[in-house]
Amino acid sequence: QERIGRFGRPFNIYKFRSMKLDAEKHGPALYAGEGDSRMTKVGRFLRDHHLDELPQLWNVFCGDMAFIGPRPERQFFIDQIMKEDPRYRYLFQIRPGVTSYATLYNGYTDTLEKMLRRLRYDLFYLEHRSWGFDIKILFMTFMNIAFGKKF
């Protein structure tokens, strides 16, 4: 999938396929919730354990992403968010991340309201980012994946 990264540049994000091939034939869709018929059984497992994100380590290696930073979004959704809150443009200052402060506290987003809440977490991260904050996010991400701890 194409996502928008640092400086507003598009890049291809790598993920394991978790949805059926024609899942977005009617246009881009938000996160698939419980019982979404577009999700495969293997895909549900991958998403529940955040394993669908592993291929993004290649994006980190290529320099498109960082380990920690705001999650990259598709242009379609960025346009919707920017209509409500133009501060989204500040996120283009840094590389998007495989994990983020917003994902830990806001989870997956399936509504515009949740996307705007995620933006507030991302802006908080942008203002307060430091090595210590990044280490805390890495630790919390590990706890979330290994033990299912929610924050």
Q: Where in this protein do the model-derived segments appear?
A:
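Conserved small/aromatic sequence motifs within transmembrane helices
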Residues: 1-151
